Amino acid sequence: MLYKRNPQLNKNGELIHLLSTEGLSKDILTHILDTAANFVSVNDREVKKVPLLRGKSVFNLFFENSTRTRTTFEIAAKRLSADVFNLDIARSSASKGESLLDTIANLSAMAADIFVVRHSESGAPYLIAQHVAPHVHVVNAGDGRHAHPTQGLLDMYTIRHYKKDFANLRVAIVGDVLHSRVARSDIHALTTLGAAEVRVVGPRTLVPPDLAQMGVRVFHTLEEGIRDCDVIIMLRLQNERMSGALLPSSQEYFKSFGLTAEKLRLAKPDAIVMHPGPINRGVEIDSEVVDGPQAVILSQVSFGIAVRMAVMSIVAGNEA
């Protein structure tokens, strides 16, 4: 019954694919975060390796460009002692018209164990997960506007590291929520982990009208949206996904929704500032904030390796 409801889980309720934070229980999310905590120290060792995925093959399939996410997945897999293969999509058979599932079938024939997939089409990792063998696992590295679960998880790890508990937290997610798969993954994870209040802040043109159904409060002014918040997650303006005149200009956006040191004082004195990257200084956030003591953006990047190690080690230990 559980497997039919959630394709990420096997019949025992164990994680076999990571496709979205939506539908994952608090216990599963906490298990991933706890496992990641055990891997953080690996990054500080002289020999930065553990043998958990020795003999396993991890294929990074990035149909969208990425530097940070692909690199951290590669580092994570290598630190688990896996063999890692980065498919050059621009030169692959996919660029010659081969279908997504045919590409997966051919790579599966090469004894792939884990596919890490980033794709511009929402649902592509789900499609792949439905067609792989029981011992093969799929990790979603971002699909369209839909989800970016490992970013959501590393955001949760970062919040827990600095704030210890979600129960009394007021969290604001600010910016281009309409096009953000990170925002959706964060919202699902925050509500499941019991954050006291999740706010979404942005111009009306960049905030989906149905967000209130996800249990969040919507604000259309930055000052009100971040007031008394414990955590502020800034989002990049995704101009490459925009069509039409959703914004007057980047300069006008910064005036209304750019986070400056002055505006940050409206949040709690010990508030932390996060950003999934890449950062556009002077558009969504001022350099003084990025380089200031309340920004934990580089910690997010560092913790991302441990979180992705946790995800791959957990799914690899379970079968459909």
From Swiss-Prot:
UniProt xrefs under InterPro entries: Asp/Orn_carbamoyltranf_P-bd, Asp/Orn_carbamoylTrfase, Asp/Orn_carbamoylTrfase_sf, Asp_carbamoyltransf, Asp_carbamoyltransf_Asp/Orn-bd
Protein name: Aspartate carbamoyltransferase catalytic subunit
Protein residues bound to L-aspartate: K96, R181, R236
GO biological process: 'de novo' pyrimidine nucleobase biosynthetic process; 'de novo' UMP biosynthetic process; amino acid metabolic process
Organism: Delftia acidovorans (strain DSM 14801 / SPH-1)
Binding site residues for carbamoyl phosphate: R68, T69, R118, H148, Q151, G277, P278
HAMAP family registered for this protein in UniProt: Asp_carb_tr
EC code(s) of this entry: 2.1.3.2
SUPFAM superfamilies membership: Aspartate/ornithine carbamoyltransferase
Recorded metabolic or biological pathway in which this protein acts: Pyrimidine metabolism; UMP biosynthesis via de novo pathway; (S)-dihydroorotate from bicarbonate: step 2/3
Subunit comment: Heterododecamer (2C3:3R2) of six catalytic PyrB chains organized as two trimers (C3), and six regulatory PyrI chains organized as three dimers (R2).
Alphabetically ordered keywords of this record: Pyrimidine biosynthesis, Transferase
Primary role: Catalyzes the condensation of carbamoyl phosphate and aspartate to form carbamoyl aspartate and inorganic phosphate, the committed step in the de novo pyrimidine nucleotide biosynthesis pathway.
Superkingdom per UniProt: Bacteria
Sample GO molecular function, one term: aspartate carbamoyltransferase activity
Keyword Transferase appears in the UniProt entry: yes
Record-stated family: Belongs to the aspartate/ornithine carbamoyltransferase superfamily. ATCase family.
Catalytic activity: carbamoyl phosphate + L-aspartate = N-carbamoyl-L-aspartate + phosphate + H(+)
